[in-house]
């Protein structure tokens, strides 16, 4: 059995594995199914899967960024990881030039490091959904341990967000981490709200 630091929740390895696989399958499938309609603000009455995809998984920057964070954890270890270390990984591995990703990369290259990299020149995207849609990695690495998940979600979110965009990742990381062991929706919301 895995137990959190506080001893509030316990989760079996089998349950942990099942939830992590469900998380990543869901993220990959959702990203692939949604990609053809991303940035299309029209109502979509989708009745089919686009044949041009041919059953292949599409590139997904939301998932790719989490894999960069996983590599950072594997190489650096959790204790050494902070927003400055993530900024190094961002500069070396995140290639997306658009929106908050591009602003963050440019800021880091100019010496504007987190948390300022999420603020400076980022007025259009600092409150966007780019941070919270990549929060699953912290929950998967810290199941049933929202305090630990939120610590690294903070380091992640402040690279390219601030304000509501930043708080959204803290909220979802806490909720997702707690959801490894807690099933009561109101309790999950209470846990997540306590972090913002």
At which residue positions do the language-model features occur?
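Structured, active/binding-site neighborhoods that engage oxygen-rich ligands
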Residues: 1-196
């Amino acid at each position: 059995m895995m137990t959190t630091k506080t001893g509030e929740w316990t989760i079996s390895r089998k349950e942990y594995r099942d939830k992590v696989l469900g998380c990543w399958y869901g993220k990959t499938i959702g990203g692939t199914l949604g990609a053809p309609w991303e940035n299309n603000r029209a109502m979509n009455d989708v009745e089919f899967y686009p044949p041009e995809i041919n059953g292949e998984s599409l590139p997904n920057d939301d998932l790719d960024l989490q894999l960069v964070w996983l590599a950072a954890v594997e190489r650096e270890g959790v204790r050494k990881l902070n927003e400055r270390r993530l900024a190094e990984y961002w500069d070396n591995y995140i290639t997306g030039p658009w929106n908050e990703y591009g602003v963050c990369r440019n800021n880091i290259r100019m010496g504007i490091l987190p948390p300022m990299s999420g603020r400076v020149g980022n007025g259009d995207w600092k409150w966007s959904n780019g941070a919270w849609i990549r929060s699953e990695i912290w929950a998967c690495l810290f199941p049933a341990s929202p305090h630990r998940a939120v610590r690294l979600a903070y380091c992640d979110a402040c690279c390219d967000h601030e304000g509501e965009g930043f708080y959204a990742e803290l909220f979802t990381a806490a909720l997702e981490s707690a959801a490894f062991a807690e099933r009561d929706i109101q309790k999950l919301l209470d846990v997540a709200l306590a972090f913002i």
